[in-house]
Every structure is written in C-alpha cells, then in structure tokens.
Amino acid sequence: MTWIGCFIVGSSFSLVMPFLPLYIQSLGVTGANVELFSGLAFASTALVSGLVAPMWGKLADKYGRKPMMVRASFAMTFTMSAIAFSHQMGGYWWLLLMRSLMGFFSGFIPNSTAMIASQAPKERSGYALGILSTAMITGTLIGPSIGGLLAQWFGMANVFLIVGALLALATLLTVFFVHENFEPVAKSEMLSTKEIISRVGDKHILFGLLITSFIIQVTTQSIEPFVTLYIKTLTTNTNNLMFISGLIVSAVGLSAMMSSSTLGKLGDKYGAHRLILLGLVFSFAMYLPMAFVQTPLQLGLLRFMLGFGTGALMPSVNSLLAKITPKEGVSRIFAYNQMFSNFGVVVGPLLGSAIAGWVSYRMAFVVTSLFVVLNFFWSLINFRKYLRKRSIVE
C-alpha cells in the first residue's frame, strides 16, 4: 500500500503540469508574465517543501513516519482541491498560496522512503527502496498524459478536484492499510540533529550523498525549460513537436522505472557506493553527447539510456543513507535528502534556461555533464577507502 500511496502522490503532482500555464493564463495573467508566473508556481512548491523538510523529519523521528504520511496527504487533499476555486478566491495569488501550502505540508514520499529504509533488512534495503522509487517515477511519468486528457474531458479546474480525491484516497489507504513498527522515543532520549550527524561514521559520505541527490535533480530538470526549442532546431517537421518533446522528456523516467529495482538489488550485492560511481560515469557518457546530436531520435535514445544511470543512482543513495544513519534519525536525514533534492528541482531549470539563453542550448548539456564529472570525483574521493569492500558499513 505504501507503493500505491507514493504512486498516487507522484502522479498527483505531475497531473497538473501540462495545463498549469494555461490555467494561470485563464486567471488573467498575460504576455511574458505567463512564463514567469508559471515558473514561480512550480518553484514555490519545491522550494517551500525543501525549507520545511527538516522540521517534518524531526517530528517523524519523534512520532513516527505513518502520522507524517497521513498529515501530508490529508493536507494536500485540501490545498490541491482549493486551487480549483482560484477564479473565485483571488486569482493567481490564491493559486500561488495553495501551491506554497502544498509544499509546506508535503512529505509523503520522503517519509515513505524513511519508513521502508528503517524497516527493511539493511542487506536488502537497495532492492526495497528501488521498488519504492518506481512508484514515484511511474506516477510522475504517466501523470502528464493523464492530466492532459482529464483537462480536455472535464475542464482544467475540475482536474484539481479529481487530484484532491486521489489524495484523499491515498490518505485512507495509508490510515487503514499501512503498518509501521515504530517505537516512540522518549523526549529525554531524543537526539538532536547535531548528535545524529555525529553518530554517522563518515560525515564526508553523508554530505556527498546529499550533494549527489541535488545534482541528480539539477541535471535531470535542467533540460525541461528549453527541450522543445532545442528539438525544434533538430528537425524541420514541427507538426508533432509537443508530442515528441513529451516523449523525450519522459524517456529518462521510463528507463529509470524499468531498472531501479534491479539495479538496487545489484547495489545490495556488489556495493551501493560502487554502483553510484558507475552510475555517474554512465550518466556523463550520456549527457555529453546530447550537446552534439543532430536529430530528435538521437536525443531521445540518449535520454532513454540516461535513465539507467538515474535508476542506479536514486536507490543507491537512499540505501547508503539508510545504512549509515542511526535509526533514531532516519527521518531527519531523509528529510535533509529531500531538501537537497527539492533545491535541485528549483536550481536545475533556472541553470539550464540561463545557460541556454546566454550561450546556447548545446552548451547547457556540456555544463550539465561537467556537474556530473565533479560529482563523480567528489564521490570517488569519499568512497576511496571502501572501493575494495562490498559495504561501507563496518
């Protein structure tokens, strides 16, 4: 049921992505402000969520992850549904407020991840977390196509009500069917975040994993602001431009979904730290050629192959975090990981669009690949004394 809940939450966020700019336009926003205000609406959720994630993580360590999952999906039921009434309640600023509150009350997926990480046997944590990550990836992948159809059939405002109903379903499923083996920690025994970090054996690895989560999101999100324009330069046939762009953007999610559980199992067998290094090398080998492609097909194939690198990185990062973190602080560490990921979601599109606008589309891919190279060498330095070992946990 945790998988189903993560799937619903993941798809709920992506369902509204295809038509949100059009909905903002219907609220009276015109001209160049549509792109600006759409960017603010998207970024506000991720930014606020990242800022408050440590607070919710601390509460999860104190009261349990399941209550935080229920809290998140229950609150998002109302904030998402309320966007349907933006025309009556204050237009764009109401929408922006609800999107920000959605970010404030979010936390379903990181708490699900922390719960699985704390309960799964450590020798199988990569496999378990890999399976869980497919829920979010699958939901995010199919959400935009379903959202576009629902908007055509029922109208844009009603889609927010439908998504609210889905989130209510996720709340009920979590309340009645998700079980957590959580032992409350006495207030006197509650560790501070500083104490939790002090108990992590190698703090360089912890910080390196957080940076890796940040860079995964920066690199995967950086293409989205200009992918349609880049594809337009690669072909003279613009009849199906939006459809082709959607396929190319979603290709990385499809292959990541296909591979993450299998690669997570390989990480358990051969070492998640080794898999991270291989994933970064492979990702670099896919990113750099994207700067030199001549056709949309070439770009799409490279994006599809890139997903196998992403599928190796995400469960491996989560698995290592679970292994090096004391159980009293799992939720807080995963909350910080979510914070770094969300900041990557905000920075990625800004960085990609800035480089594409100031230099060129192709240079944006070169810079992205350099970020991956830097992350590889940093990780190599952090993991250097564990390369001959299957596990970094003594």
Model-derived features: positions:
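Hydrophobic core of transmembrane alpha-helices in multi-pass small-molecule transporters
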Residues: F7, Y92-G107, Q298-A312
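Short amphipathic helix-loop junctions that connect adjacent transmembrane helices
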Residues: F19-E35, F226-F243
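Helix-to-loop junctions at the C-terminal end of transmembrane segments
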Residues: L51-G64, S259-G271
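Helix-loop junctions on the cytosolic side of multi-pass membrane transporters
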Residues: T171-K187, I381-I392
